[in-house]
Amino acid sequence: GRGGKPVYIDLFHQQIGRALITGTSGSGKSVLGWRFALEALANNIPVVGMDISSSGNSTFKTAIELLGDQGAYYDISSGSSNLLEPPDLRRFDKLERERRMESWKDFIRRALSAIAMGKIHNPHLAQRVDALLIRALDVFLRDPEIITRYNRAFEMGWRSPEWQQIPTLPNFIKFCTRESLNLRSFEDLDRHALNQIQSQVGALLASRLGKAIARPSTFSPEPAIKFFALSGLTNEQDAYLMAINAHAACIRNALSHPRSLFI
């Protein structure tokens, strides 16, 4: 605190849950944040985080490297993080699984809406895109083949052949049709919205970002602390999409555990 007065914050044993650290560049924000991370690890609470480093130098990267196999620092632009990989909810009871799955679906729907709409400002179209994505996600996640592929991927684990068959964005986009969604009343706005989803997602899949967002994840789920880095992205739209994917990876990891620290 100012004037040399210490401030005691306990995120793990009191009902605080959140902390905001602000400061100018080089003021020690990351060092202070790292203290919370170490306390979480001491309490067997996994840590996930996003690190936006414009220079490529990172306090978090240096600290995580000192942890050896217990920590992992991933540059999300040099690997793949499957946007449609759900959290691993097998440790939870049915009610908690459903609650956490709904949280994940809500985030993915918002991420897909952002991809589909880009910089277009059209409230009516955005609303219809959102509604169709909700429906498409429900149909997709209830499809027997999709369910089987997800279950097999999690049963056999990361790096298994079954993991390479986990559903991804190209599988989802095939469900974004009038027939798959069983749209009996089909207005021009529906046609426009589906075309917007298909064209924007299709363009993404054809770009260099496609491999980073639409393939099975190449990041191990094992380390107790994982940071997803965003660096070297100069294009504003690319940076935005990669930030969405890094955020999705953090949300996925956080939802997979009863308690977690998200930095």
Where do the model's predicted regions map?
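Basic- and hydrophobic-enriched, low-structure N-terminal and domain-boundary segments
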Residues: 1-22
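P-loop NTPase motor domains
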Residues: 1-7, 37, 42, 52-69, ...
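Walker A/P-loop nucleotide-binding motif
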Residues: 25-26
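Conserved lysine of the Walker
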Residues: 29
